[in-house]
Amino acid sequence: MSKNYVQIDPKDNIIVAITPLEKGLVTQVAGKQVVLKETIKQKHKYSLNDFDIGDEIYMYGVLIGKATLPIEEGCAITTENVKHASAEYQNSKEKFMWTAPNTSNFVRRTFEGYHREDGKIGTANYWLVIPLTFCENRNLDVLEGALTEKLGYETKKDFAVDTEALINQFKAGATNEAIFNTPIISTKEEITKNRLFSNVDGIKFLKHDGGCGGIRQDSETLVKLLAGYIVNPNVAGATIFSLGCQNAQISMLQDAINAIAPNNKKPVHYLEQQQSASERHLIEEAVKHTFLGLVDANKIERKPAPLSKLVLGLECGGSDGFSGISANPALGYASDLLVALGGSAVLSEFPELNGVEQELINRCETAEDSKKFYDLMSAYSASAVAVGSGFENNPSPGNIKDGL
């Protein structure tokens, strides 16, 4: 097989261009010569044989589409001549045997993590500031301005201006020349170099546009999401802003936390603006609670932990025609290694699994799990179709341009 193009699976009838392929190039795939009838862009695909309208197209060994136009052997596969298609799947498991990778090089390895009281171990140590409704986003901006830069955490700014240095020079009676020559610009690196709390990685301000104004189920889903952030082992504690009259009430968030972490002992400070004496009092209280929370969080130090305590979160971004033959297999193998060591891997963006549903169903350990996944994919597909869309619209124009 040439290094310039590749057939990923013996069942595939389209070929991936590893480099740009010029029209007229003679390619050799699986003992067959194919002359390219047009130039094929890097990351894009060309046909291994002729396709009639409706013919099935395979890649990675699975059905990915059907021809919408006649396609000659050696021609580019595009959204103009192919439409999305995927194999039917059933809520019944086929025989599957997982072969665990060799973990002998990793069984005694550890990582330096933050040990939480519930037994979970984080790889980071953050404090969260969360609004229960979008009405409180402004207060998060105020808190961020009051804390982030002063405590030495990275801000969105590339530099900071220290006007106070000029004021101090003036008060000290400095000459105009001395004041003018006083350095007042700090780079982002200089700001973070003097971080006050060395064991706290930062403060995350989780602004959003939910919590009120929609249906009640939206707020119920929101508080479950926020509860998940709070109990995450990468989080030391949280400051919660509530307006008071919104759909997403404090009690709902507390119930959501108790549902997933009944023994949660992390500090969570709830501030309700409509119960506060004034906005200034609310901000003062929030700053003090958050600062003292950071003081306690800073007492937690990294300690060795087994790899079985790791949970690897997987997320796509900028996917292209090479993702399926580079990053995805690498992350898949890393996930297999981690799972074999007793750890976990989580892929939450389930629409990415369209086309391999049966493979995932086969891998489920219980009938309950396989039904849950089956129902999830079926419900999402039905919801997308109901609004005139579908899985075929998952890739963005940028993804498609880059060969996905």
Model-inferred region functions:
Residues M1-L404:
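Metallocofactor- and cofactor-centric catalytic cores in central/energy metabolism, strongly enriched
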